[in-house]
Amino acid sequence: MQQISLYAKISNSQLKICLHALASLTGMDPITILQHTMVWAPAQKYTPKILPGQGGQLDQYRIHVTNDNKNEDKEKIISYVQSKDSKEDIHNLANRQWHFQIMEMPEAGKQKTTSQSISSWSVKKGDSFQFLQSLAYKFQYEYWQKGFQFVYGNAVIQLTRIHILDQTTKNIKLLDPSKQWLVKVYIDVGHLTDIEALNKAVKELEKVKTELHGLMNLEIPDRNAFDTRIR
């Protein structure tokens, strides 16, 4: 899958007017989202010997494992770190329907949007943590994305903030004390080789950017911010 995207930041004071404007633009009420993401990394770094005449390098990537638990309130949120103290919690957490993603670096060069290759799959049944451990991966860290989502044509518009576990209260708290919101507008294209669909997605995002101009400035972040490779 190839994901075409643009990003912006808005202050907490701008949220209400942005939600109102997006509801008017899309013709829908915002959907509340709450996503729990865990990042797993290889337990050992793999450094293959590159023989003379062999080009390229073999990179190892972190795996992002995401579960949509928007129907749960904060009291029901189960942290991987906390769940290790409870067999029931770790079992319930491991057997949720997790979505796996390996994300490559976005394309380099002068681009109108961020274009990133993503390999994704889901584990609908069974222990996802045992599966990851069988791949020689280990848990690294976790976070939660809370916010709102709209759909406009083929584009998904998300306004979210990152939360992390508060070790004192055992609830989740905002990571960024400035309380800013991250806006992500994206379109998923099935295949990198589908040039027509990719071009159409880029044009559609450019249209969204123009329509939201004055409300927010959608742009391309530094591609290094997307680097999930093991160094």
Curated annotation (Swiss-Prot):
UniProtKB keywords: Activator, Coiled coil, Nucleus, Transcription, Transcription regulation
Main subcellular localisation: nucleus
Subcellular location: Nucleus
Any Pfam family the entry gives: Med18
GO cellular component term, pick one: core mediator complex
Coiled-coil stretches: 191-218
Protein's UniProt keywords contain DNA damage: no
Cross-referenced InterPro entries: Mediator_Med18
Gene Ontology biological-process annotations: positive regulation of transcription initiation by RNA polymerase II
Gene Ontology MF terms: transcription coregulator activity
Subunit structure: Component of the Mediator complex.
Function (record text): Component of the Mediator complex, a coactivator involved in the regulated transcription of nearly all RNA polymerase II-dependent genes. Mediator functions as a bridge to convey information from gene-specific regulatory proteins to the basal RNA polymerase II transcription machinery. Mediator is recruited to promoters by direct interactions with regulatory proteins and serves as a scaffold for the assembly of a functional preinitiation complex with RNA polymerase II and the general transcription factors.
Family statement drawn from the similarity comment of this UniProt entry: Belongs to the Mediator complex subunit 18 family.
Protein name: Mediator of RNA polymerase II transcription subunit 18
Organism: Yarrowia lipolytica (strain CLIB 122 / E 150)
Gene expressing this chain: SRB5
